[in-house]
């Protein structure tokens, strides 16, 4: 059985694949539809995913400045660089993840001014689930704009072992 830290690393490999698919989905929107408010909403939703990942890394002490939680007006061309920088920082953090870090409690100041305390495991679980939620929204927006929505469910990424030959 793999450790919980190993599972978080594996799940982040999956999330990185989903990030690439999300960028491809956004790029698939026809040029004539990119001026639509829904397109900017989809791009900004992806920027929010990046910002959320950075915000949690900041709260954990591994990102210098807290990002704006809901970026507006992000350019599609800016997303690949934002994603790459964020992924590199998360890979570096997760490479050092162990049971002691997962159990560590940390405190942070929320945007509403309240302070919270949580264990790292809970924060990583929230961050992972948060991405699933918004990727579904991005896929719906892309499909509505005439782009190619991609199913980013985990089952399509993991390596299943077929037991029977296809009929």
Predicted regions and their residues:
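Extreme N-terminus of proteins, especially the signal/transit-peptide cleavage junction
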Residues: 1-6
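Short, contiguous alpha-helical
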Residues: 9-71, 111-167
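Mid-chain, well-packed structural core segment of small domains
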Residues: 102-109, 118
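Helix-adjacent hinge/juxtasegments
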Residues: 62-104
């Amino acid at each position: 059985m793999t450790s919980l830290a190993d599972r978080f690393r594996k799940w982040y490999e999956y999330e990185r694949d989903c990030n690439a698919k999300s960028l491809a989905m956004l790029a698939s929107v026809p040029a004539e539809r990119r001026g639509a408010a829904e397109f900017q909403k989809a791009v900004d939703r992806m920027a929010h995913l990046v910002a959320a990942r950075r915000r949690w890394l900041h709260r954990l002490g591994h990102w210098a400045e807290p990002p704006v939680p809901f970026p507006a007006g992000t350019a599609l061309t800016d997303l690949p660089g934002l994603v790459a920088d964020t992924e590199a920082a998360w890979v570096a953090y997760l490479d050092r993840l162990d049971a002691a870090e997962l159990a560590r409690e940390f405190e942070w100041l929320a945007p509403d001014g309240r302070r919270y305390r949580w264990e790292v495991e809970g924060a990583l679980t929230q961050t992972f689930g948060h991405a699933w939620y918004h990727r579904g929204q991005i896929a719906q927006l892309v499909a509505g704009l005439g782009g190619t929505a991609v199913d980013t469910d985990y089952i399509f990424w993991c390596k299943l072992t077929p037991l029977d030959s296809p009929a």
